[in-house]
Amino acid sequence: MANIKSAKKRAVQSEKRRKHNASRRSMVRTFIKKVYAAIAAGDKDTAQKAFNEMQPIVDRQSSKGLIHKNKAARHKSNLVAQINAMQ
């Protein structure tokens, strides 16, 4: 444990930020899973709606650095391709 006051403060701030980021990361994963679940169920309308809800959230979190921009782009690209391939 830190002895210096500023180091203690940084440790508290870091833990607070870690919990906040974990919550946000979990939210992003949940939105992505909803789209995959709709695709697996074969429901194109639901998949499209879930994707439209997911996209701005993934973009926002990638712009804030929570997830890498390439990872966000990869998820969106894969999901759009799967939705378009549905009948």
Swiss-Prot record:
Record GO biological process: translation
GO CC field: cytosol; small ribosomal subunit
Regions that span the bilayer: none
Classification via Gene3D superfamilies: Ribosomal protein S20
GO molecular function, one term: small ribosomal subunit rRNA binding
Segments of this protein annotated with the region Disordered: 1-26
UniProt superkingdom: Bacteria
UniProt keyword terms in alphabetical order: Ribonucleoprotein, Ribosomal protein, RNA-binding, rRNA-binding
Pfam families: Ribosomal_S20p
Family of this protein: Belongs to the bacterial ribosomal protein bS20 family.
NCBIfam families on file: S20
PANTHER family: 30S RIBOSOMAL PROTEIN S20, SMALL RIBOSOMAL SUBUNIT PROTEIN BS20C
UniProt function note: Binds directly to 16S ribosomal RNA.
The protein's name: Small ribosomal subunit protein bS20
Organism (species): Yersinia enterocolitica serotype O:8 / biotype 1B (strain NCTC 13174 / 8081)
Lineage: Bacteria, Pseudomonadati, Pseudomonadota, Gammaproteobacteria, Enterobacterales
